[in-house]
Amino acid sequence: MTIRRLSFIPIFALVAVLAALTSGSAHAAPNTPDPATGFLLNGRQLTPQGAQVRLGNFPTGGAVTADGRFLWTVSAGLGANDIRIVDTVRRRVIQTIPIPGASGGVALDSRHRLAYVSGITVSRWWPTQATLPGAAGNCILVYGWKAASGKARFLRVIPVPPQPGSLPVQAFPATTATNAWPQKLAVSPDGSRLLVPLNLADSAAVVDINEHDRVRYVRLASGAYPFGAAILPGGRTGLVSNEATGTVSVVALRTGVKRRDITVGPPLSHPQDIVVDRAGRRAYVALSALDEVVVIDLHHWRVERTISVGRSAGLGTMPVALAISPEGARLFVAESGADELAVLHLPSPMTRAGLTWTLVGRIPTTEDPHAVVTVAAQGGRAAQLMYVAARGVGVGPNPTGPVTTDPFDPIWWAFNPIAPTTDVFGPGSGVTYLAAMVRGQAGLMALPSDAQVKRLSPAATRQIHPLGAQKAPAGTPLRAGGPIKHVFFVVRENRDYDQVLGDIGRGNSDPHLTIFGQDVTPNLHALVTRFPLLDHVFANSEASIQGHFWTSAASVPDYVDRNWVQEYAARGRPNDFGVYAVTFPGNGFLFDQAERQHISYFNYGEIAGDQPTLGDRDRSPALLAEEQRVAANSDLGPGLTPGGTYPAVGGIGQVTGSDPANPLDGEIFDSSLPAGAPPGSYSRIDSFRARFESQLAANAVPAFNYLCMTGDHTRGTQTGFPIPTAMVADNDLALGQLVDLISRSKIWSSSAIFVVEDDSQDGADHVNAHRIPVAVISPYARKGAIIHRRYDLVSVVRSMELIMGMKALSLNDALATPMYEAFTSRPLNAAPVGAIPAKIDLLTRNTAAAPWAALSNRLPLGEVDAVPQGQLDAILWKSVHGANSTPPPAGPNAEKGQ
């Protein structure tokens, strides 16, 4: 076979990138994420290979026609879901087909020119798509395409509902609802059968295409979460990977009977994509939670070997998709966590002796690759390699995306009992939201030779390392056994930098975008004046589900990353994130690592990985015991912790389980209880103070203290609740009281307090919509410094890990940029910190006359992130600046909702 020389078509100038990487200057590295240059929030500088084609919102599916002419991609994000067909010769999208909802499953039968796409329920945010075929969800959408043009037309819908007797989906709170959720797909070589894993129904569907789409169900293990599918060359046997049970089920397609389960990894190892070689001798399975590829011997139905495709720095390359080269000599592995393709030697006459099963090298891609395909050379065209990356190069500027201010705009229908009549996030809505503007990309290239892959490997390795890395300065307190013995990690909700600190008058700030400035947040302003002002810290998240994984685990598992967007989009995905084992990261959470290393800790309010009282089909006795140990060192408040007094992060402004007839019963304050508060009220800080003083008396203050403080999320202008500025001011007072309490204690000299936001989805920012206000408070924190270096949430986590001597949980925190620049080697900032009293009345309540009070009263503002952020942005702006004021534009790099 002739392989042409690889065409290098990166979308960024590699020379400039290498110059930045090799420069010794601390200022050579950029400090602002910029899609125009491929510089990401986490500090990675993308240098992707291949001609790049812009795709839709978060594409996770890809399949190519047998002739290699047309690449089908499936957009499966929070925004508009669609099919985009790429002409791989002209390297452009030739057709976009709107669909109600997608999970990313797509399979092509090139013999009959039929395409099959997994369909899920239409989003209520997109009412114009409710009339599209398959709007009820749980179906397969069938299309035909023309050989010459590649253009497709819709043919029919194949329903695949959950089979009778299916168990309810696992959700928090619990539900009786069932769902199927067709996931990846496989079509038999002759096109007669389709194999459909049903991710939420513990089963697979076998569709007999030639028998009027007759559907038979194959029952799999309870709590299996079936995901990937493959069919052997003879067309009689299918394989289904099961994410939670760590197995591959072997299915007889003629009878619809499961023959056996092959264990390919431990429970919760998340087997995902499966591919079978042309001879039907071996199958390959990607284990996304373990950074491994498993080889199955299909003659003996057993695991032949397991191959690591991870990085030595830590877990988290996340292999999610596979493709075998046309000649069968190599396996291409899409690694969504490392933005690369790993390439492995397979047994083949073309493979040199001794190289079988070894790593050839790695190919850098754009961000978050979720699909990879290969095509044989034909018609004078070289063999091809193609990939689909869900996040592309990040999100670009949005200078014309102001927050909608018209109360009669369709956005205001979003949480009305009457469904919206126009698309909330559609063209012309004027609404922007983080995640809905994420755009994927396809990378197209000639199939590289081994030598070319090896030459690309150094670029892939450079790409995963953040720019501007620093060596630990001499005497830094960010070290195990150093002077800092107690870490306090405060996680707040959703504010961006300019919304709070735009009026600080220092650093890179814009007062025109400020809502909760000096008068509302005097404590934070004072803290970032005395301690470092960090004006380039970015949230890695778009919303709270991701945000609390980043803060508590330094990573977001692929299961969470691909599913939270559809839960937020109201397409029927249950909320199981962080509370059911199937959603947990491979190495667990910070609390789990503290347990493993015997590092003392206490958790105030974080529910991620801390719900042992819930029934869970996938929780082993060992995992249950681990959760119980964490729960014993946690306070999640009434209803979740026996005798608990510190409310969990799940609700805003109310105690879980308060009296529905009295919406103010059990109202929660972040700060000390204000005088005149309603009966039964209490505060997070009062709860913390009682436990902290007890720990001090016993000389038992933990090394790691994690505190959720959520009152700054606000309740909008809902009648009877504190006005937004009062809730944010109360949260600010809580922060001031926390620092005051710690700084006047006997452990202050050995303490550090890190304050972050879980995400940045609220407000406008002139630098980047992901920028957040962060405070670092310690006797060792630099006095009055202004620090422009780029950091992210994982930088904060890594800094805390270094202090505690905690091992990194993932590739993300292992490679993150520690906040060395924020600290000094000596305690030069050791004076106690006094809390500044609130400058506004914390008991001021919204009245029916408040701006858009009627609208706020219809919204579920007591639930985290249950309201489109653009909507809440406008409410908050008008609550401060008046009903006739106009909120500012979203600013550069905003995503939908900002």
Residue ranges and their predicted role:
Residues 1-12:
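Bacterial N-terminal signal peptides that target proteins for export
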Residues 5, 191, 235, 328, ...:
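A generic hydrophobic-helix recognition signal that picks specific residues
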Residues 16-473, 481:
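Predominantly soluble domains enriched in secretory-pathway, periplasmic, or organellar proteins
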Residues 438, 452-898:
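N-terminal pro-sequences and low-complexity stem/linker regions of secreted or lumenal proteins
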